[in-house]
Amino acid sequence: MKFKERFNEVLKQSGKKQTEIALALNLSKQCVNDYRTGKTLPSIETLYLLCKYLDVSADYLLGLSDY
């Protein structure tokens, strides 16, 4: 799976909204939407924050692990 697919899956499972994530991580809503649609990928720093906030590993989001 690609990052956008994993990211969308984790968002759905977490029940968190794009706006909520954007506010919590000081990102724009457009930025979060770009991650969801695959337009862009997060920086390493943002990936770390996303993983911490969503309680998921970077390996999982990047498709390197199924856990």
In which residue ranges do the predicted regions lie?
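Residues that mark the N-terminal boundary/hinge immediately upstream of a DNA-recognition element
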Residues: 6, 17, 43-46, 57
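A short, Lys/Arg-rich alpha-helix, primarily the initiator
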Residues: 1-16
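DNA major-groove recognition helix of helix-turn-helix/homeodomain DNA-binding modules
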Residues: 26, 45-60
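Conserved hydrophobic/aromatic packing and binding residues within compact polymer-binding modules
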Residues: 7, 21-22, 32-35, 61
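Alpha-helical residues within the helix-turn-helix
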Residues: 12, 23, 52
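DNA major-groove recognition helix of helix-turn-helix
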Residues: 11, 36, 54, 62-65
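Recognition helix of helix-turn-helix/homeodomain-like DNA-binding domains
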Residues: 26-41
